[in-house]
Amino acid sequence: MIDQAKAPRQEASPPSKFEHKVTYVPPRTKFAFGMTEIRDLAIATLLVSGVGLSMLGFELLNIQPLLVVLLLALFTSTFLMHEIAHKITAQHYGLWAEFRLTLIGAVITLISIISPFFKIIAPGAVMIGGTASKETIGKTSIAGPLTNIIFCMLALALTFVQPSSSPPSPFVVVAVVTAFFNAFIAVLNLIPIGILDGWKVFQWSKIIWALAFTTSIILISVLLAQYGSLLGFSL
C-alpha cells in the first residue's frame, strides 16, 4: 500500500494571453516511398536491368521474347529487394531511409552495360539519417546482400526440380540466371572497400562478413562450374 501525502492547496494561476499550436511534426519512420525516391529507383532499375541483359551469353540473347521479359522482371526484383531490405532494416531501427541515385554510380553502371568485361552495379544507395551505432549500420548493410544470398539459394534449388536436358529448359535458364545475378550482386556488395556494404559489415563483425562473403563466393563458384557455358562463360 502506498500512502501519498497531500500537498497544500494552491490557488489556480490566471489564464495566459498566449496561445500555441503545433507547426512541426517529426517525420514518421513508417515504410513509405517519396516521389524523388521512386524516380531514382526507376532510373536505377533500368540501368541494372541493362547490365543484367548484357551479362547474358549469346545463347540466351536468342531466346523467346517472353523469357527476356521474365528475366528483366527478375533483374528488377533482385535490385529492388536488395535496396528495400536496406530501407526496411534502417526504418526498423528508427532511422530515416530513402534510395538516392548518385551521378558517378549511375555513370559507372551505364558504362557496364556496353562494356563486355567491366561489370559494376552501383547506380545509387539507400541514404540513412539519424543516430546509429556501428551494429545498427552493420545490420542495415548486411540486409541487402543477405537477401540476394537467400534468393540465389532458392533459385539454385529450383534447378533440381526439373530433370536436366540439352538444351536446358526455359525454367532452368530463368532459375540459373536469377541465381547467378543474385550471387553476383552479393559478392560485389560484400567486397570490404569504400562505401560498399561489405566495408560496413566488416567494421561491425568480421565473422558475419566472412560467413556472408564466403557463402556468396561458394554460390557463384558452383554456378559457374555447373552452368558456365549456359551463362556464356568458357571455363
Map each language-model feature to its residues.
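Hydrophobic transmembrane alpha-helices and their immediate loop junctions
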Residues: 1-235
